[in-house]
Regions:
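Extreme N-terminal starter segment of soluble prokaryotic enzymes
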Residues: 2-6
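Glycine-rich FAD pyrophosphate-binding loop
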Residues: 7-9, 20-44
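N-terminal Rossmann-fold NAD(P) dinucleotide-binding loop
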Residues: 15-16
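N-terminal FAD cofactor-binding segment of flavoenzymes
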Residues: 41-87
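N-terminal Rossmann-like dinucleotide/flavin-binding domain of flavoprotein oxidoreductases
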Residues: 44, 58, 67-68, 117, ...
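Charged, glycine/proline-rich intrinsically disordered loops and linkers
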Residues: 85-109, 209
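Short beta-strand to alpha-helix junction loop
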Residues: 98-128, 249
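Predominantly flavin-linked oxidoreductase catalytic cores and closely associated redox partners
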Residues: 123, 127-249
Length: 249
């Protein structure tokens, strides 16, 4: 006998988005979301794209995100390849003819996204999911899977509790919950990269590279060993990281 209709492993944006939308479109279904962290947790992946705006609106959480005080992101600037000139990309540069040809209509114009502190952003999404009726279990660590033939029927939690569901969604991100237990995880050797990052305060705002405190851009710069990111996440704080190969380190 199932304990619920859907078990979601992982309380990041993927898990909260899925859980929220399932409850919206099937309010009678019981959805249990398992998040291993007992409270808000640090994470990278701080520069968002405008393509998620329609999703946030469908979830009913757009106003909460837009009103949270995150710096608005208007685009991206790059220094990439042999030509070291700055390549500017603005979200509001819309090619009307191209959009008409591709979609047959002009979709909603979205001019910005946000640069976010993930502990705050993810917490807003998690609390919103809970407010829609999703059963959120914090500090719930899934340590194994329950199998019914070839079917994954549920999870085993730390402490031995078994939880069964009609469906199981692995939204654990890099943790790769299901792929580890099913031993089906494979790495692309060309993408075996690592990232080192830190946060800096007091860095000058450079409009050419990032913008100004309420209207920013991510700045991406290629270097011989990989590439750097420069993401303004607050009025006086930037996230700076280097992505490079394992061999370089």
């Amino acid at each position: 006998m199932n304990d619920c209709d859907l078990i979601v492993v992982g309380g990041g944006p993927a898990g909260t988005t899925l859980a929220t939308l399932v409850k919206k479109h099937a309010p009678g279904r019981r959805v249990i979301l398992l998040e291993k962290a007992p409270g808000p947790r640090h994470h990278i992946g701080e520069s968002l794209l405008p393509g998620l705006v329609p999703v946030l609106k469908e979830m009913g959480v757009f106003e909460k995100i837009d009103g949270a005080g995150f710096p608005r992101k208007l685009g991206a600037n790059y220094v990439w390849g042999r030509d070291r000139a700055v390549w500017e990309n603005d979200f509001n540069d819309v090619n009307i003819k191209e959009m008409l040809a591709r979609h047959g209509k002009i979709p909603e114009k979205i001019e910005y996204a946000w640069q976010v502190r993930r502990s705050e952003y993810d917490e807003i999404l998690l609390r919103h999911a809970q407010s829609t009726g999703v059963e959120v279990r914090r500090g719930a660590v899934a340590t194994g899977i329950l199998e019914d033939g070839e079917r994954v029927a549920g999870v085993v939690l730390a402490g031995g509790e078994e939880l069964r569901g009609e469906f199981l969604a692995d939204c654990s991100g890099q943790n790769g919950f299901l792929s580890r237990f099913r031993r089906i995880r494979e790495y692309n050797p060309q993408l075996k990269n690592v990232a080192g990052y830190a946060y800096f305060k007091g860095a000058p705002w450079k409009y050419r590279f990032s913008g100004h405190p309420d209207k920013t851009k991510i700045f991406v710069c290629s270097v011989a060993c990989g590439w750097f990111w420069y993401i303004p996440i607050a009025a006086d704080e930037v996230s700076v990281g280097l992505v490079t190969s394992v061999e370089f380190l």
